[in-house]
């Protein structure tokens, strides 16, 4: 996938420059409808399997839903690959816009501070991913404790004589999804601002390059690895041959695969897809602050660039900030 992505970037740039890269990103975004359909397939099959098991339907029903869910995990990994590739192309286009507005002619990795920024940028996706996975684990344990409490304090749940307090479990997941994402979101927003205003636009360019490269690799790896772990767990439903011996559900290898899936699910559903958001958000924040940290001039340099007006072989030069305030007759008169 990385070689294909690199080839797409090189060919797009060769034929139409950075504009071609932007068009390539737009072209990949054109597959959004297909990606949504692919991503929706897996959760639907997974929910169908859960309903079949809770309803105590025949085992062949659960077997069919497991097969569908395994296919869903594979298609979801494919769809996430498209998403991360389009995010990489979009980030590259935003990066080019940042370089232009910030007035950078080149980013020299021989400079120690730029190289340091490159390393810091490469580290950010790992921190972001760790925080996301940790948040999932904390929320899951809170929900497990709540379920245990309900079994302990509300008699008759398993005999269908009492109704569980579903809303409390929903509240736990909702609250965790908001509160636990404050720190990862703050990292994506604050780091570009902090680096840009303290170290300058060239170092910030190094950070963005590191985030993009590391984030794309992490996103593809986590989406594929998470789907593989999930499918490995499901394969024990029919039996897995390990060194000539068949192992089924509730065996020791199956228990190990369940443990692996507790990492795989956050990989493929949380931290993997979040890499798309991270690399695009940091590029957008950098683009927003670019005029304020530009190499040439102050924060309003974009409107202070000289504009030359030519009328009847004569010309006049004034700043864009002044030019946009004048109407056409005034500009013509001024030029004359």
Kindly give the residue locations of the regions a language model identified:
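Hydrophobic, small-residue-rich transmembrane alpha-helices and their short perimembrane loops
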Residues: 1-315, 319, 325, 336
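Eukaryotic, compositionally biased intrinsically disordered regions
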Residues: 331-335
